[in-house]
């Protein structure tokens, strides 16, 4: 019988963590057990949850807690993420200090999920870069700007050598810069930049609107030649992401933005672990990219949480790996540390670290590319800066984060 394993962290589980775990296992499956007649117990046995493990520990704050793993028969729910979450964490999420830390799916259940269409290798193949972290930049200050302003931003970022450019997640459908026009006009700008530089740049356009409208809009984006779709996954739901990944008429990579996820992950006592929501479930539902706060920037996660997301995005599984995108407050002086912690297969994502460069967005992009090259070539960053005026200016403005051995 196939089972799904759910691991929880119970803060202050009471005097008997084993008893609390058993209450959860029974309460979220057959409802009661000891009061049932033997015949009914036999009939319901295959639907009964079971406690796999209970480990009592202390939190980092010295609080008593228990890590509990419960097995749920997959016969109890349909093979979709909403059914799973409702089963293992529906009413339970309302029942005191309890956090869903992980889900372990059976191989048969995984076969019903799409995973990324392109994954790390597919994205690299589109860009033609395989031996370094990719570089992404973000539109900045876009509210109230017209199409000409956005086109110039796009052009300057592309000339700086970035591999991907994404819309701001708060750029919605506007009269001055409508969705379809951003795709068609942006495509022209990037083609012109390619002719000038010989470097391929992909543009992630923000897919927004009412849920019922999104599929038609995504299909139209594909027809118009869009490169990538940016989706605020947790404003819409993982099932919406999955529906795009499964649709053959939407043959585009999907970039999952973490907007709203903080309300679901940030508490130590409630909600989901960062790695489950932004790592595993994003990947399983079909995200080719997963953005999340880096451990170093302006909206930082603890390093263990950021690395756990990266691990869920990239570790061996039946699905293609998702490109991990640690973000927020990234500048060129952080790149050696980013590459030490996240290796080659991640995307360096910068906003102000590119647009705030003294030589503009193009200079910001060149500074990032220079420091990436320095790390790959094992050249001291200060030596590289002597031959890269843009990197020198960036280090003077933002400084450098030291890498401990």
UniProtKB/Swiss-Prot annotation:
<dbReference type="InterPro" id="IPR017717">
    <property type="entry name" value="Diketo-Methiopentyl-P_enolase"/>
</dbReference>
<dbReference type="GO" id="GO:0000287">
    <property type="term" value="F:magnesium ion binding"/>
</dbReference>
<feature type="binding site">
    <location>
        <position position="257"/>
    </location>
    <ligand>
        <name>substrate</name>
    </ligand>
</feature>
<comment type="pathway">
    <text>Amino-acid biosynthesis; L-methionine biosynthesis via salvage pathway; L-methionine from S-methyl-5-thio-alpha-D-ribose 1-phosphate: step 3/6.</text>
</comment>
<feature type="binding site">
    <location>
        <begin position="166"/>
        <end position="169"/>
    </location>
    <ligand>
        <name>substrate</name>
    </ligand>
</feature>
<feature type="binding site">
    <location>
        <position position="140"/>
    </location>
    <ligand>
        <name>substrate</name>
    </ligand>
</feature>
<dbReference type="InterPro" id="IPR017443">
    <property type="entry name" value="RuBisCO_lsu_fd_N"/>
</dbReference>
<dbReference type="Pfam" id="PF02788">
    <property type="entry name" value="RuBisCO_large_N"/>
</dbReference>
<dbReference type="InterPro" id="IPR000685">
    <property type="entry name" value="RuBisCO_lsu_C"/>
</dbReference>
<feature type="binding site" description="via carbamate group">
    <location>
        <position position="166"/>
    </location>
    <ligand>
        <name>Mg(2+)</name>
    </ligand>
</feature>
<keyword id="KW-0479">Metal-binding</keyword>
<feature type="binding site">
    <location>
        <position position="169"/>
    </location>
    <ligand>
        <name>Mg(2+)</name>
    </ligand>
</feature>
<dbReference type="InterPro" id="IPR036376">
    <property type="entry name" value="RuBisCO_lsu_C_sf"/>
</dbReference>
<dbReference type="InterPro" id="IPR036422">
    <property type="entry name" value="RuBisCO_lsu_N_sf"/>
</dbReference>
<comment type="subunit">
    <text>Homodimer.</text>
</comment>
<keyword id="KW-0413">Isomerase</keyword>
<feature type="binding site">
    <location>
        <begin position="351"/>
        <end position="352"/>
    </location>
    <ligand>
        <name>substrate</name>
    </ligand>
</feature>
<feature type="modified residue" description="N6-carboxylysine">
    <location>
        <position position="166"/>
    </location>
</feature>
<dbReference type="Pfam" id="PF00016">
    <property type="entry name" value="RuBisCO_large"/>
</dbReference>
<keyword id="KW-0028">Amino-acid biosynthesis</keyword>
<comment type="function">
    <text>Catalyzes the enolization of 2,3-diketo-5-methylthiopentyl-1-phosphate (DK-MTP-1-P) into 2-hydroxy-3-keto-5-methylthiopentenyl-1-phosphate (HK-MTPenyl-1-P).</text>
</comment>
<dbReference type="GO" id="GO:0016984">
    <property type="term" value="F:ribulose-bisphosphate carboxylase activity"/>
</dbReference>
<feature type="active site" description="Proton acceptor">
    <location>
        <position position="91"/>
    </location>
</feature>
<feature type="binding site">
    <location>
        <position position="329"/>
    </location>
    <ligand>
        <name>substrate</name>
    </ligand>
</feature>
<keyword id="KW-0486">Methionine biosynthesis</keyword>
<dbReference type="GO" id="GO:0015977">
    <property type="term" value="P:carbon fixation"/>
</dbReference>
<keyword id="KW-0460">Magnesium</keyword>
<dbReference type="InterPro" id="IPR033966">
    <property type="entry name" value="RuBisCO"/>
</dbReference>
<comment type="similarity">
    <text>Belongs to the RuBisCO large chain family. Type IV subfamily.</text>
</comment>
<protein>
    <recommendedName>
        <fullName>2,3-diketo-5-methylthiopentyl-1-phosphate enolase</fullName>
        <ecNumber>5.3.2.5</ecNumber>
    </recommendedName>
</protein>
<feature type="binding site">
    <location>
        <position position="168"/>
    </location>
    <ligand>
        <name>Mg(2+)</name>
    </ligand>
</feature>
<dbReference type="GO" id="GO:0019509">
    <property type="term" value="P:L-methionine salvage from methylthioadenosine"/>
</dbReference>
<dbReference type="GO" id="GO:0043715">
    <property type="term" value="F:2,3-diketo-5-methylthiopentyl-1-phosphate enolase activity"/>
</dbReference>
């Amino acid at each position: 019988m196939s089972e799904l394993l759910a691991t929880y962290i119970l803060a202050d589980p009471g005097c008997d963590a084993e008893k609390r775990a058993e209450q959860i296992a029974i309460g979220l499956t057959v409802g009661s057990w000891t009061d049932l007649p033997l015949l009914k117990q036999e009939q319901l046995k295959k639907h009964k949850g079971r406690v796999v493990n209970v480990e009592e520990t202390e939190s980092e704050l010295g609080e008593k807690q228990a890590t509990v793993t419960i097995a749920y028969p997959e016969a109890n729910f349909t093979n979709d993420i909403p059914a799973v979450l409702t089963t293992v964490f529906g009413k339970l999420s309302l029942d005191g200090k309890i956090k869903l830390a992980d889900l372990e799916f059976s191989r048969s259940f995984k076969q019903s999920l799409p995973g990324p269409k392109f994954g790390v290798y597919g994205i690299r193949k589109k860009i033609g870069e395989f031996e370094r972290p990719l570089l992404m930049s973000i539109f900045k200050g876009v509210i109230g700007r017209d199409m000409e302003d956005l086109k110039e931003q796009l052009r300057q970022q592309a000339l700086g050598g970035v591999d991907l450019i994404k819309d701001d997640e708060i750029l919605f459908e506007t009269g001055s810069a409508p969705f379809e026009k951003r795709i068609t006009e942006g495509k022209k700008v990037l083609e012109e930049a390619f002719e000038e530089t010989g470097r391929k740049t992909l543009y992630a356009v923000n897919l927004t609107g009412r849920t019922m409208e999104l599929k038609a809009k995504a299909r139209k984006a594909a027809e118009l030649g869009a490169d990538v779709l940016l989706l605020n996954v947790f404003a819409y739901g993982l099932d919406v992401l999955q529906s795009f990944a499964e649709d053959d008429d939407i043959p585009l990579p999907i970039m999952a933005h973490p907007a709203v996820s903080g309300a679901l992950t940030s508490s130590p006592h409630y909600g989901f672990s960062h790695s489950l929501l932004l790592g595993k479930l994003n990947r399983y539902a079909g995200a080719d990219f997963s953005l999340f706060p880096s451990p170093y920037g302006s909206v930082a996660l603890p390093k263990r949480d950021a690395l756990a997301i990266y691990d869920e995005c990239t570790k061996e599984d039946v699905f293609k790996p998702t490109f991990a995108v640690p973000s927020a407050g990234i500048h060129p002086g952080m790149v050696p540390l980013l590459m030490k912690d996240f290796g080659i297969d991640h995307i360096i994502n910068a906003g102000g670290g590119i647009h705030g460069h003294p030589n503009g967005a193009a200079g910001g992009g060149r500074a990032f590319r220079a420091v990436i090259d320095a790390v790959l070539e094992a050249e001291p960053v200060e030596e590289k800066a002597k031959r890269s005026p843009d990197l020198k200016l960036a280090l003077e403005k933002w400084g450098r984060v030291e890498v401990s051995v």
